[in-house]
Amino acid sequence: MFYPAFLNLQDKKCLVIGAGTVAERKAISLLRSGSDVHLISPRVTERLHDLIQHNQISWFDRQFQDGDTSGFFLVCAATDSTQTNTRIFKEAHKKNGIDLVNVVDVVPECTFAATSIVVLEKVSISISTSGKSPAVCRRIREYIESKFCQDTINHLEKESLVYKDDKKTPVREEHTFKSKVPYPIGFLTADRQCTIIGKNNKLLERVNLLRKCGAKVKMADDDTLRRDPSAFLTFADVEYQEYNGSQLVELTRNPMQGTFYTPLITVDHDLVIGITPNLDSKSAWQYAKQIQTDLATQFESQGYGHFLDFLGSLRPKVMTSIPTPAKRKQFFEDIIDQNSKGEKELCCFDFGDLGCSNECTFNLVRTHRTDQIKKTIQKKIQTYSYN
């Protein structure tokens, strides 16, 4: 399970290395969160080219070079070379000490993972399956968009950007959270030390969540106000004397002043849905709480976590047996929509009916009847591996 958080990226220097749609998505998400976005790539997509032409993104028209990651707050590696991506991770995280590094599709070379997000008029909602099923994540995102359609502004990947006088300006300025949409992520905290400074109910909640995420939690005394160099994340309810905006710190007394904050959450095993208001006000947080309660009824203790565990258990076999990302993606789509008779139909995931009893993969898994589908899955893996 990844630790859910929203980053405060206003004016932070962020670097994306790579081309293609993945790099485009990374760059646009960071831009919409207020970042000072830099891109290194010998080629760019049409949409990125438009942003560069309007001075929204700083572009370096070349391949990655040693030393490129120096001075950045966050680095995303999205090249088509595994070796290059590994070089980027080692330089950024291990040599330069950058805490926020993401290598696309390589969890061991990530300190965080980006999550899907739905931006509503009053709140933003992040969805993470902790990397176990992008297909499930997408369907939940689409369901949430549909459920709150009268309030939906647009999904990050579809929304157009706003230009003003050819300068970097807030995108969708009506969504003011430091003038930007917050950047949703999941911290990979397993076996990483996280320091807690102070004692209150919020911090106790953070401790419990961190432990669920596999973090090593260190409790500090109230008067320990200086940075712990061994800490990946720091949570404090007191004034943090050495905080300069570069460390990963949540200040629970004033979340908007830290580098990140923990949203309201709905959790079922590795399914984590985060809800945060787009305005920092009492009424906005109350509305976010209402959304949290609604989504908890829909998603907590309904079998989604077990379903993700099942799909995640298939990934090692699928990764070694099915040769291309496109085929692997389609395999999981087919499995999700499979019923017990081997027929393909669109699975509702109980979104519209909590009492749904269709003999689909989802219902068979959550009622512990996986033996009925394992043979079908094995045959499908063989089919995809040969085609």
Enumerate the language-model features and the residues they cover.
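Hydrophobic, well-ordered beta-alpha structural blocks that scaffold small-molecule cofactor pockets
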Residues: 1-43, 50, 163-221
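Short beta-strand and adjoining strand-loop segment in the mid-core
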Residues: 36-38, 73-81, 123-131, 270-282
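Short loop/edge segments at beta-strand edges and connector loops
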Residues: 41, 59-63, 105, 221, ...
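Short, conserved SAM-binding/catalytic segment
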Residues: 47-57
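Short acidic/histidine-rich motifs immediately flanking catalytic phosphotransfer sites
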Residues: 55, 70-74, 227-233
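Conserved SAM/SAH-binding loop
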Residues: 61-66, 222-225, 238
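ADP-ribose/adenylate-binding Rossmann-like module
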Residues: 74-80, 85-113, 234-261
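An accessory alpha-helical subdomain
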Residues: 129-180, 188-191, 267, 277-387
